[in-house]
């Protein structure tokens, strides 16, 4: 009886944790920086939602970069990258993914529904800059949302930072980092909930299955000390991608903002990659 009671308590606790993990992360973003003139966006999505963001035009012919933040964040997480890229002449678009920041959305879906925001933003950028090349930088959830979005036409270059290949493994990594071997029990309970909460199958949340279909040069980056998306998983994602591709494993970095962690090496790697494939 005690064993059954313990199992019931564990299931209830896992259900409550699952509720917290998939809750929307709505929060006010506020006005754009006063010293950086941008257009404020409110874009309809093909999922009957609204995506909010900012767009700043760069120099003609330099191309554009769409920036996609990680989970439980918003466009402000990509602001430093956006300003750096804009200084180099790129047009930049940064959005709040669905269920984040000021965008609509009832549940965080770990990439699938967030893909609607990617499609809306890409369509807007291409409409604003006809004939120019467009790159995407996606961190963690943002990169997964791009891979799961099946956006067409697709980007001309892609930077994926700390992107999980498979949601089940991503859950296990995060749970195991906090409670060790108990993840053997808790991970299956959390993974079991996702289809019930989000009306999808776990097989739909495997970005690794879609990286080969990008059809664009890709730079894949992650920290060598990342316990959420391990170096082995990052290499699996890299191996699944088509050429041309590049891999950057950042010494000493965990699952962190790689630009904040190593700004100069980041600029060297990412700007070199974008300049090469956007024809800057």
Over which residues does each language-model region extend?
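Conserved alpha/beta-hydrolase
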Residues: 82-104
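Hydrolase active-site cap/lid region
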Residues: 148-203
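Conserved alpha/beta-hydrolase "acid-adjacent" motif
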Residues: 227-233
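Catalytic histidine neighborhood in serine/cysteine hydrolases
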Residues: 238-256
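Catalytic histidine-centered segment of alpha/beta-hydrolase-like enzymes
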Residues: 253-267
